[in-house]
Design a protein with these regions (language model features):
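Conserved AdoMet
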Residues: 33-75
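Short amphipathic alpha-helical segments
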Residues: 10, 26, 30-34, 61
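Membrane-targeting and insertion segments and their boundary/processing signals
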Residues: 2-7, 30-34, 38
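Non-catalytic nucleic-acid substrate-recognition regions in nucleic-acid-modifying enzymes
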Residues: 1-26
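Extended aliphatic helical segments
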Residues: 2, 16, 29, 45, ...
Length: 75
């Protein structure tokens, strides 16, 4: 099952903003996705149907959970 990039972004921001201010959480999510998936900050706007594989989506959600637990983005 694939997920849309925009859904991953929204869930990521929601998860990470439990520890960080929303603006900072947004920046962290975009930075992670740019590095991990090679997407740009505007990809979800330019390509609303951009799909992410199940494996990549799960890896992203796991990383967002770790960020929300205080693990630095660099790890």
């Amino acid at each position: 099952m694939v997920m849309l990039l925009k859904d991953i972004i929204y869930k990521g921001i929601e998860t990470v903003s439990t520890l960080y201010p929303e603006r900072e959480a947004r920046e962290m999510v975009f930075a992670f996705l740019e590095h991990q998936l090679g997407t740009k900050r505007h990809t979800h706007i330019m390509e609303p149907a951009y799909e992410v594989s199940h494996e990549d989506a799960e890896a992203a959600m796991s990383a967002f959970g770790r960020m929300a637990a205080g693990e630095p983005l660099q790890y």
